[in-house]
Curated annotation (Swiss-Prot):
Species name: Agrobacterium fabrum (strain C58 / ATCC 33970)
Keywords from the named record: Cell inner membrane, Cell membrane, Membrane, Plasmid, Transmembrane, Transmembrane helix, Transport
Gene Ontology biological process: amino acid transport
Stated role: Component of the nopaline active transport system probably consisting of four subunits: Q, M, P and T. This system is also capable of transporting octopine provided that catabolic functions are induced with nopaline.
One of the Pfam families matching this protein, by short name: BPD_transp_1
Compartments where found: Cell inner membrane
Organismal lineage: Bacteria, Pseudomonadati, Pseudomonadota, Alphaproteobacteria, Hyphomicrobiales
Protein name: Nopaline transport system permease protein NocM
Length: 241
């Protein structure tokens, strides 16, 4: 094993970390915004609305993210005329847009199920108490249901965040030079895949470790009973959910 190559590759791959994090952040932000209405649609008593949301979630969860990314990036060219007419072709021809769209749609489907589970975990007694004090349905959701649902869903959502960060590596297949894409370029020049991918793996490992600690801290902060259990100080370690 070439230790010198490992040392030299580390700063080079670190230069691609901002690209990886930017892809993940934008995708997660868009995905979360989309996931909330999708989750509410899944819980709707209207069968048409619920079925539409279910169909979207089922299709996304049943197909590989790589296939979804390829369909958006390569498949959009089949509709170039239509996309040009509505002014979207300039976006769809950009790898960044296609990667973010694929990642956002993917995480939105998974996150909607996480949020749906969180909403369903809210006890009926809390909802009835909100009704008793005269809260409207919207106010109940904003002040009671949604905050509790987020606390309940946070551990699972933390896993989704880490999954999307790792999934940004697929963007390298459509010419985006993030950590994995840059690793491939270095490998093509050095013919040493093991050393380079060890460094890339270590970088992903560190990023996901930091995210898991941040999620743990957020979970501790949002749950008063957890703070009381550890005497008001943040826990030094916690299991990854």
């Amino acid at each position: 094993m070439d230790i010198q190559l490992i040392i030299e590759s580390f700063p080079k791959l670190l230069a691609a970390v901002p690209t990886t994090l930017t892809l993940a952040f934008i995708s997660l932000l868009i995905g979360f915004v989309v996931s909330v209405p999708v989750a509410l649609m899944r819980l709707s008593k209207n069968r048409i609305v619920s079925s539409l949301a279910y169909g979207y979630v089922y299709i996304i969860r049943s197909t590989p993210l790589l296939v979804q990314m390829f369909l958006i990036y390569y498949g959009s060219a089949q509709f170039r005329g239509v996309l040009s007419e509505v002014g979207l072709w300039s976006s769809f021809r950009e790898p960044w847009f296609c990667a973010i769209l694929a990642l956002a749609l993917n995480t939105a489907a998974y996150t909607s199920e996480i949020i749906r589970g969180g909403i369903q975990s809210v006890s009926l007694g809390q909802i009835e108490a909100a009704r008793a004090v005269g809260m409207s349905t919207f106010l109940q959701f904003r002040r009671i249901v949604f905050p509790i649902a987020i606390r309940q869903a946070l551990p699972a959502y933390g896993n989704e965040v880490m999954l999307i960060i790792k999934s940004t590596s697929l963007a390298s297949t459509i010419t985006i030079v993030e950590v994995t894409g840059l690793a491939k370029q270095i490998i093509s020049a050095t013919y040493s895949p093991v050393e380079v991918f060890i460094v890339a793996g270590a970088i992903y490992l560190f990023i996901t470790f930091v995210v898991s600690r941040l999620v743990m801290l957020a979970e501790w902060w949002l749950n008063p009973h957890m703070r009381a259990r550890v005497g008001g100080t943040a826990p030094k370690a916690a299991e990854t959910h």
